[in-house]
Structure formats: structure tokens, C-alpha cells
Amino acid sequence: MKYFDIMSLECKKIGIEFTEEKYGKFMRYKELLQEWNKVMNLTSIVDDEEIVKKHFIDSIKIFECEHIVKAKRIIDVGTGAGFPGLPIAIMNDDIEVVLLDSLQKRVNFLNEVIKELNLKNISTVHGRAEDFGVDKDYREKFDVAVSRAVANMAVLSEFCLPFARVGGYLVALKGPGINDEISTAKKAIKVLGGTLDKVINVEFENEDFQHNLVVIKKQNGTPKKYPRKAGKVSKNPII
């Protein structure tokens, strides 16, 4: 129960319940992450405490956005090792979560975690956002699209906004100093049917790093020509 108190405190601050059962799932997730990371590149963060703070708590902080709390269906685009999608599913089993990633090895890892943690409200999809963003079973079918991927906001918006329903949201987990990136992405956000809703500054107790939650509201349907085919989104962003 070494990290229970710190995780419980951070959850209490944002008004969500943290239990010993949830803690146990996070600790098993940590063990699997460390185990699989020895044979494939899942994360550069391998220390117990760093995983808890920079992966688990960082992901849980997304609940500071009320649209996450209210959501019934969320897709995590480019989920990697499962952040923030898996922690969202662990914290709230009323939310249906879909994890999308382009690398089969990572999807295999995610499936193992889901099985080990006996999570019933989460599934994985192997593929690219550019392909599934035009698939009628996924396009505009989610209350919220989330991503902690490293792409800039213009690129991330084209990857993610097609998944959000009209009236839904994109919530991107970004680092500090986000204003210039948002300004550059304004055209892309508008073209794709979105508008900037707000930026939530996320602070961490006794830590020198901070993050921002960039919240984009989907006001209009995304034009049919977006997302563009694989490769074009990153090479030629809408700016």
C-alpha cells in the first residue's frame, strides 16, 4: 500500500473515489508494464514512484475535466502503453473505453493488462487513426476523444476530432507552454469542426512539472475528406 495515500489524496482533490481494489489494479498494471518493458519499448519511465506519478496520477488528473466525468464512451487515440485510457477505465467502470494503437505489440500488451485486471468496460483496436477515423463504426461515435500522444495540436486534432460526436470533445494532455501550439492549430481545429473550449492547468503536489488539458468542443461535423490518408496528416498539417 506504499502509494495508496498519494493516489488517494490526488483523487480526493478532484472529487473522485479511490479504493483499495482500484489501487490493486494499478499496482498489477505497474508490474505488467515493467515486465513487458524489458522486452519491448513501452515507456522510458520504469521507476515505481515515477510510474505512479507520471503515468497513473497524470492520467487520473484528466478527471479534472467535467466532460470526462460525464462521458459514457471514450476513445484513446494513440494510447501507447494505455495512458490515459486504461486509468480512466480503472477509475470509472461506467465509462466504455476504446484504446486505439497502430502497433500490434502494444495492443498485445494492452490486452494482457485488460485480461489480468478483469476489466469489462474497455477494448482495444489495432490500427491507425487515419483509417478508423473514416470508419462508420467509429467516426463521430464517441462523447470524448482523448490523447496523450506527442503530436502537435494541429495534427492531433485531425487524428482525434473525427471520432468525437457533434457536441462531444477532444481532450488532449499536453505539457506547459501550450499557447503558441494552440494558436498554430486554430485553423485546423475550426476546419475539423471544433472550437477551443478551455485549457485546464494541472498541477502536481510537491512536483516541479505541470501539464495542461486542452479541451476542444466539436461544434460541427468533420468534413468527409478528413482525416486524410496515412502520412499526409503529419507531413502537411492544416495550418
From Swiss-Prot:
EC id: 2.1.1.-
Protein location: Cytoplasm
GO terms under cellular component: cytosol
Disulphide linkage map: none
Principal subcellular localisation of the protein: cytoplasm
Residues binding S-adenosyl-L-methionine, per UniProt: G78, F83, A129, E130, R148
CDD domains named in the record: AdoMet_MTases (cd02440)
Regions annotated as coiled coil: none
Top EC class of this enzyme: transferase
Function: Specifically methylates the N7 position of a guanine in 16S rRNA.
Name of the featured protein: Ribosomal RNA small subunit methyltransferase G
Annotated source species: Clostridium acetobutylicum (strain ATCC 824 / DSM 792 / JCM 1419 / IAM 19013 / LMG 5710 / NBRC 13948 / NRRL B-527 / VKM B-1787 / 2291 / W)
Lineage: Bacteria, Bacillati, Bacillota, Clostridia, Eubacteriales
Originating gene: rsmG
